[in-house]
């Protein structure tokens, strides 16, 4: 047995008595001490600034103490433009909380940004703070677990872009367009004496894009069940207008937008799950029963329930994020130019003889209903230019990457770097509003692509509408087809003119928008007057 000597026994008298020791302190004193300690730790955290590679670009002066460059979220384009203008090299650094970000600009930096293998797009997602997926953590469907570095998400989108699937669902998409546009004369206030009316393209075209995308990328049941579709429209609309990226800058500050993103993502999950479960259960032991839709492709691949639902939530959000707005943009702008409408109509009339017998009578719209996929994709070059110009002018956003390597990445021609562990960001307006590539860049002119400037022909990645470099839009085939279908049906069925809410003709409207805000919108007070062609 150990023999403890008196001088080795610690004095424990501090634990007893009423006048000394921590245990004798009042609860209030303990609470204040804890609060003071926590506050001190928090202030140290706020004051701490991580070290940055000395070769990183200089920091922009457009910053707020402790938070960083809030303008990245609140003034998306003007913050970027002004920071580039103040930089000697066109590159600049800024903080978002404790996250170091390098803003890059110019052709060489853009190519580096889009091509470098160590700049990861998915791991940079937290900087955006938009959409239904809250990251981190990154869900399995978005991780590069497939061949060639593809994710489950990319692999399944590519499956849905195959000709067999698009052709099999084409009629569902064209039928939806015809139904929506045909409903205009009866659903809208008609003008006396003519088969015409007035419509705001925003809501009608937005809902059309949503219903088409669900039929192409999910299943018919969601659209055909009115109550379910209305819920889907409402939840998606909320998510489209929520931005909680500032949680990167102020993670210690509660965020209502962040909470709402989680909530509406949960509501979509609850909406989609029963439909997927029903399909999975219906396939058990029934080899002969197979639906003809995207959900069936996922089920036939043996995909798990959670992966299917997560994929569907993400793919539908992405597929309508730009198309939902662009459909209204295209119609709104086309109203102001009858010459462009005539060019589209000429392409329609030139396309129908390719597949429709000359001796078989039919209206132009009936012929469109029977147009095969290969004709849709090859017969409308001017329509494609209109779409391209609409994307150039109306799809503006900051792209982000994370340097996941252990080495700094040189920014060509600057002597500066994107440090290891730092984010890189690029604003698409840097290319799309470049006067050297696009003269008078704020003027909508699809014909500029017919005779592009030499710089626009040769500059690498001068157009970013469908992504570029290592991250091209894997769903662009459907996106182009969908926008083409809607524009072609609109022109085939009606003549269009721009007007106010009372049907009075409007002079040309400036369709520029506030590029600083998230979720930009169409010009307000602009309506479309339509007159039936047939």
Curated annotation (Swiss-Prot):
Molecular functions per Gene Ontology: heme binding; iron ion binding; monooxygenase activity; oxidoreductase activity, acting on paired donors, with incorporation or reduction of molecular oxygen
Positions glycosylated per UniProt: 6, 145, 403
The keyword Lyase is assigned to this record: no
Membrane spanning stretches: 30-50
Entry superkingdom: Eukaryota
UniProt: heme binding residues: 473
Pathway annotation: Secondary metabolite biosynthesis
Topology versus the membrane: Single-pass membrane protein
EC number: 1.14.13.-
Broad EC category: oxidoreductase
Known cofactor(s): heme
Subcellular location(s) of the protein: Membrane
Keyword annotations from UniProtKB, A to Z: Glycoprotein, Heme, Iron, Membrane, Metal-binding, Monooxygenase, Oxidoreductase, Transmembrane, Transmembrane helix
Pfam families, per database record: p450 (PF00067)
One GO CC term, this protein: membrane
InterPro entries xref list: CYP450_sterol_14alpha_dmase, Cyt_P450, Cyt_P450_CS, Cyt_P450_E_grp-IV, Cyt_P450_sf
Family statement: Belongs to the cytochrome P450 family.
Function text: Cytochrome P450 monooxygenase; part of the ergochrome gene cluster responsible for the typical purple-black color of the ergot sclerotia. The ergochrome gene cluster produces several ergot pigments including the yellow ergochrome secalonic acid and its derivatives, as well as the red anthraquinones endocrocin and clavorubin. The pathway begins with the synthesis of atrochrysone thioester by the polyketide synthase (PKS) CPUR_05437. The atrochrysone carboxyl ACP thioesterase CPUR_05436 then breaks the thioester bond and releases the atrochrysone carboxylic acid from CPUR_05437.
The name this protein goes by in its record: Cytochrome P450 monooxygenase CPUR_05419
